[in-house]
Amino acid sequence: MARFYYSTTFAQTADKVWAVIRDFNGFQWAEGVGKSRIENRKANNEVGAVRDFRYYDRTTRQRLVAHSDTDRCYSYESVEPLDTLRSYRQTLRVAPIVDTSTAFVEWTAEFDAPAEEHERWQKCLTEEAAKSLEKLRTYLAEQ
């Protein structure tokens, strides 16, 4: 398994950032994400919920495997392959930066792809995380 990591800071508090991103089915703040729905009659943040959503020009499905409001994090995994990305498990976490009342956000993933594709997927995932969190930053600044 290969890994990806991206982190950034936000001017808002961890609670304010988490309030926007905590909803597993409310992923429209992310880059390239369109209409989303939970397909298996679970609550949006219920472990086992499968979201079916538009990601750029394709339909993608992901399963929520962990969610904690206390720890301000959730993890999800692919339900089906995405090109040569056979599987992945991603975690999004928000932590407070106490001395400045701001937030630290990290996005990590473990993924399975052919070895010759690891660098390409690491770059792709990093770029998408950066664009998504920048879109979130813009959204929060407008609130």
Regions found by a protein language model. Give the residues of each.
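Hydrophobic ligand-binding cavity/cleft-lining segments
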Residues: M1-A43
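Hydrophobic residues positioned within well-ordered beta-strands of beta-sheet architectures
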Residues: F4-Y6, A49-R51, Q62, Q90, ...
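Hydrophobic/aromatic beta-strand elements that line small-molecule binding cavities or substrate pockets
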Residues: Y6-T8, T60-A66, Y88-P96
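Solvent-exposed residues in well-ordered beta-strands and their adjoining turns
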Residues: T9-T13, R54-Y56, H67, V79, ...
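A short, structured loop/turn motif at beta-sheet edges
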Residues: A11-D15, A66-D71, R93-F104, T138, ...
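Glycine-rich portal/gate segments that line the openings of hydrophobic small-molecule binding cavities
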Residues: N25, R37-D83, K131, Y139-Q143
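Beta-strand/loop substructures that line and gate deep hydrophobic ligand-binding cavities in soluble
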Residues: V79-K131
